[in-house]
């Protein structure tokens, strides 16, 4: 990873230095930049491919200048250091925009977290790495006139990217599409986007309530966080609207269970849910330097003619043995058979068995498939899913 640009000698050089810092963070493939004040200096850390790592350390005296410049760029209160603040900046000099900034007071000073934005158009559904059957199922769900499409996974799993790809795939000319988000992460032409503002009482439920009076065809709710939002989203899906939303849950079946715990009756879920999709992001092994995983790889090559299970090595091109990330997906299309099984009280393992019988692999199945092909490592599957792939 490249070194930081030299510290500026004069205060008037600070803006150019900060722009260069942001540009280098982006070039390093970082999704987040952390500025962490400590007793002996300020540590800059980057999150790359979902994993945090130390970048550089700068003198403690420079922390206030760096924080001040970023706060000015994000139009935050420069004098307020006691309370957390949230903002957004765009920096033409660094070549990146739509950077989310969050500050946090700590015992050593203000910590900053910068979520580096992704400029350009919304992602294409065909570039998400979905299998042909999964892509077809998602496309069919998006063509429905009403119902609920639920994307689930933990923070950092790529749910928002998938939502934006879904919205971009819709016909914006013949449908009125509106969103409620926290925050708006990407501007989509032809779509009415609203950001929640909790400080003035503008939360998901209140915006959704207002949007339903705006004659929408498609609604995107950034996240279901409470009973009221869950109830309103399901009611909207029942009354002639296609609703796309996300939920924090570990799997497709867990997402349905979570909605049940939020007060949505089973029969209502069976009637309104069109598709649930769980997803994760795994680090893709660098094809230049990946190393076969002992004798197991030879057996896999002989049996499948694939590259076989591999582990990360690291080279000058990739730095840490990884080259980007790859998505794994678990789909639960709510057809009549699965809806009946859900209403009959079939437990999670039973529902997952039904999914496999219908040809819908689980997250662990997809991870194992990529591992056997040498695209991801066993260690990364353990990091993301909590268990290693079965041999």
Language model regions located:
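Short, flexible helix-loop junctions that flank or precede catalytic/ligand sites
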Residues: 2-391
């Amino acid at each position: 990873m490249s070194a930081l640009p030299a510290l500026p000698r004069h205060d008037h050089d600070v803006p150019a230095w900060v722009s260069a810092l942001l540009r280098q963070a982006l070039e390093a493939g970082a999704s987040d930049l952390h500025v962490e004040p400590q007793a002996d200096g300020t540590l800059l850390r980057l999150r790359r491919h979902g994993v945090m790592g130390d970048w550089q350390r700068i003198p403690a005296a420079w922390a206030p200048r760096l924080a001040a410049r970023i706060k000015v760029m994000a139009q935050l209160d420069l004098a307020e250091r006691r309370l957390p603040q949230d903002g957004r900046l765009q920096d033409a000099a660094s070549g990146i925009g739509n950077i989310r900034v969050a500050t946090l007071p700590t015992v050593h000073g203000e910590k900053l977290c910068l979520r580096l934005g992704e400029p350009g158009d919304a992602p294409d559904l065909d570039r998400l790495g979905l299998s042909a059957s999964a892509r077809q199922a998602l496309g069919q769900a998006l063509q429905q006139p009403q119902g609920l499409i639920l994307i689930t996974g933990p923070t950092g799993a790529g749910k928002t990217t998938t939502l934006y790809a879904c919205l971009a795939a819709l016909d914006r000319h013949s449908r009125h599409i509106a969103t409620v988000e926290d925050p708006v992460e990407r501007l989509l032409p032809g779509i009415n986007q609203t950001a929640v503002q909790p400080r003035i009482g503008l939360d998901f439920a209140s915006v959704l309530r207002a949007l339903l009076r705006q004659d929408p065809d498609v609604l995107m709710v950034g996240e279901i966080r409470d009973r009221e939002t869950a109830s309103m989203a399901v009611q909207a899906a029942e009354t002639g609207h296609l609703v796309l939303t996300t939920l924090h849950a570990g799997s497709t079946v867990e997402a349905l269970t979570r909605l049940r715990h939020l007060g949505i009756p089973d029969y209502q879920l069976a009637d309104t849910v069109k598709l649930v999709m769980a997803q994760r992001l795994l680090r893709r092994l660098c094809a230049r330097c990946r190393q076969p995983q002992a004798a197991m790889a030879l057996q896999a090559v002989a049996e499948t003619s694939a590259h076989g299970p591999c582990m990360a090595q690291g080279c000058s091109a990739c730095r840490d043995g990884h080259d980007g990330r790859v998505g794994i997906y678990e789909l639960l299309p709510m057809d009549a058979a699965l809806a009946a099984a859900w209403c009959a009280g079939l437990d999670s393992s039973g529902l997952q068995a039904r999914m496999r019988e219908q040809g819908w692999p689980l997250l662990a199945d997809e991870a194992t498939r990529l591992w056997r092909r040498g695209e991801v490592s066993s260690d990364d599957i353990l990091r993301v899913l909590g268990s290693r792939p079965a041999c």
